From Swiss-Prot:
Top-rank lineage group of the source organism: Eukaryota
UniProt feature, compositional bias: Low complexity: 289-305
PANTHER family: TUMOR PROTEIN P53-INDUCIBLE PROTEIN 13
Protein name stated in the entry: Tumor protein p53-inducible protein 13
Keywords of the record: Cell membrane, Cytoplasm, Membrane, Signal, Transmembrane, Transmembrane helix
Residues annotated as signal peptide: 1-27
Tissues expressing the protein: Expressed in heart, placenta, skeletal muscle, testis, brain and lung.
Recorded name of the encoding gene: TP53I13
Chief site of localization: membrane
Native organism: Homo sapiens
Length: 393
């Protein structure tokens, strides 16, 4: 049998006055759960992140939002699920299900998908429900002609858009679940990952996450799946939802045949470490998260052996080019300004001529022929005009 529905005063007392103590948590559905559970009650599971899975529903139940729990689950978890159900919907459907696993004994199903939870995460559940409803409404608008043939479409689980998961109730639940005094006595909460609920710093962070701004949402991405799940995959595809103040459901990957269900193919959702703790709703007027810090500039690369070898090769080629240019220039200059043999210093073997020998050799040389003037002489040459006249005779 489902846990009794809590009153709105109980939510207020749990969130603000802390009057919902461990005695009230343990009392209630314990006797009924023990009667229906074939074995002993399960202990509190490790606090892991929720995950989204596909579920097969009948055509008559395709529009229902159902809260499932295992009869052997801890009574505190059942009361958590009941508080969440009556905070999100006016007339919720709480149903026991023996196919649930011990690590995630709480499941929230809506429009063909299921959100499996180890502990109740109000922010996750509220955001997931509103996201599923928006996508379902967009799908109805796309198939309005087909739906008009079979009559009016079934109504939403709650009348009106603002009556599904009221913001104040969800925020009160998130605050109540984060309180230390609200936990059952004699139970030590175990967690997986870097979170440590037993430390005071982690508890303060969870309270701050319940009242502070939530991280931005990321769109669901689905890889390739089997042909049987193509129809369910198409129902999930669509434009990302509108602005919402609850944390988003992270990336979902299809894993067919995973354990933990009799008629559903399980999919694991990879969640960052800091988004698993329960949080509350935040008004849209609050400031958005700070933008990402700019990436640091790349450091300049140092010299490598290849760059050093290339530099040395370039220097060697430059030196050879300059040397070749100078050699060619010197050769040209030598050819242009080369002189003949000296009239004073003849080529001798020992190169030790004296001044007297040089003068004697110069005097013994035949006389050079006198150059004739190109001008025409005014008078004819006479017989005593000199050697030229004699030579002419």
């Amino acid at each position: 049998m489902a846990p009794p529905p809590p009153s709105p005063q109980l939510l207020l007392l749990a969130a603000l006055a802390r009057l919902l103590g461990p005695s009230e948590v343990m009392a209630g559905p314990a006797e009924e759960a023990g009667a229906h559970c074939p074995e002993s009650l399960w202990p509190l599971p490790p606090q892991v992140s929720p995950r989204v899975t596909y579920t097969r529903v009948s055509p008559g139940q395709a529009e229902d939002v159902t809260f499932l729990y295992h009869p052997c689950a801890h009574p505190w978890l059942k009361l958590q699920l009941a508080l969440l159900a009556y905070a999100c919907m006016a007339n919720p459907s709480l149903t026991p299900d023996f196919s649930l696993t011990q690590d995630r004994p709480l499941v929230l199903t809506a429009w063909g998908l299921a959100l499996e939870m180890a502990w109740v995460e109000p922010a996750w559940a509220a955001h997931w429900l509103m996201r599923r409803r928006r996508r379902k409404q967009r799908k109805k608008k796309a198939w309005i002609y087909c739906e008009s043939l079979s009559g009016p479409a079934p109504s939403e689980p709650t009348p009106g858009r603002g009556r599904l998961c009221r913001r104040g109730c969800v925020q009160a639940l998130a605050l109540a679940f984060a309180l230390r005094s609200w936990r059952p006595p004699g139970t030590e909460v175990t967690s997986q990952g870097p979170r440590q609920p037993s430390s005071s710093g982690a508890k303060r962070r969870r309270l701050r996450a319940a009242l502070g701004p939530q991280p931005t949402r990321s769109a669901l991405r689905f890889p390739s799946a089997s042909p049987g799940s193509l129809k369910a995959k198409q129902s999930m595809a669509g434009i990302p939802g509108r602005e919402s103040n609850a944390p988003s459901v992270p990336t979902v990957s299809l894993l067919p045949g995973a354990p933990g269900g009799n008629a559903s193919s399980r999919t694991e959702a990879q969640v960052p470490n800091g988004q698993g703790s329960p949080g509350g709703c935040v008004c849209s007027s609050q400031a958005s998260p700070a933008p990402r810090a700019a990436a640091p500039p790349r450091a300049a690369r140092g010299p490598t052996p290849r760059t050093e070898e290339a530099a040395w090769a370039a220097m060697a080629l430059t030196f050879l080019l300059v040397l070749l240019t100078l050699a060619t220039l010197c050769t040209r200059l030598h050819r242009n300004f080369r002189r003949g043999e000296s009239i004073y210093w003849g080529p001798t073997a020992d190169s030790q001529d004296t001044v007297a020998a040089v003068l004697k050799r110069r005097l013994l040389q035949p006389s050079r022929r006198v150059k004739r003037s190109r001008r025409r002489p005014l008078l004819p040459p006479t017989p005593d005009s000199g050697p030229e006249g004699e030579s002419s005779e």
